[in-house]
């Protein structure tokens, strides 16, 4: 499978060779991965204003972004715009989001090591291109051990403190 690169953005076929991969999805099997925004790898996408231009210029139905360390995203269908902010209570560990045909989604899976949305648990997402669904996950981990490794490495104390605060 060939992976084209352009300005820090990679378009990747979601299915392995010989698999259907995303037959139910409107835009086919391709997704886009970007560190910040698909338009600028250093851009933070924090709100609908930031998401507007990337959503307008997306060439795939789903684009995964990061940079903010905040789990969630944004969606657009015609003239409807929505912010996606999964609030996963400590008693739950996942939240599913359907990707309906005809929509575009900017998805931030969150951060395993440094969440910045005031939830200390590790955050990630799994994309199912056949079911057309993104499942956001939260997983508890040994924060004290991680804080100890940060301090032992000689890194600033504030980096260790922020882990338990999720910011």
For the regions a protein language model found, what residue spans apply to each?
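Active-site neighborhood of phospho(di)ester-bond hydrolases with catalytic His/Asp-centered motifs
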Residues: 34, 62-67, 106-110
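Short gly/pro-enriched beta-turn/loop segments at secondary-structure junctions
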Residues: 26-29, 57-59, 65-68, 101-102, ...
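Active-site neighborhood of divalent metal-dependent phosphoester bond hydrolases
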Residues: 1-59
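Short, surface-exposed, charged loop/turn segments at secondary-structure junctions
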Residues: 42, 46-51, 75-86
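Acidic, His/Gly-rich catalytic cores of divalent-metal-dependent hydrolytic chemistry
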Residues: 79-167
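Short beta-strand scaffold segments in enzyme catalytic cores
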Residues: 21-25, 71-75, 123-127
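A short, charged
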Residues: 61, 68-75, 159-167
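Active-site environment of divalent metal-dependent phosphoester hydrolases
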Residues: 39-41, 64-76, 98, 114-119
């Amino acid at each position: 499978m060939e992976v084209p690169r352009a300005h820090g953005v990679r378009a990747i076929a979601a299915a392995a060779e010989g698999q259907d991969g995303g037959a139910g999805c409107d835009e086919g099997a391709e997704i886009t991965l970007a560190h910040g925004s698909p338009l600028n790898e250093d851009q933070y996408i924090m709100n609908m204003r930031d998401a507007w231009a990337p959503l307008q210029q997306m060439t795939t139905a789903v684009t995964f972004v990061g940079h903010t360390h905040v789990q969630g995203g944004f969606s657009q269908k015609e003239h409807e715009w929505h912010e996606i902010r999964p609030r996963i209570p400590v008693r739950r560990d996942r939240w599913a989001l359907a990707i309906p045909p005809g929509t575009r989604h900017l998805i931030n899976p969150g951060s395993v090591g440094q969440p910045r949305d005031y939830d200390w648990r590790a955050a990630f997402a799994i994309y199912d291109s056949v079911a057309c669904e993104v499942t956001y996950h939260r997983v508890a981990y040994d924060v004290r051990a991680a804080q100890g490794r940060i301090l032992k490495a000689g890194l600033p104390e504030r980096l260790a403190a922020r882990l338990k605060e999720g910011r």
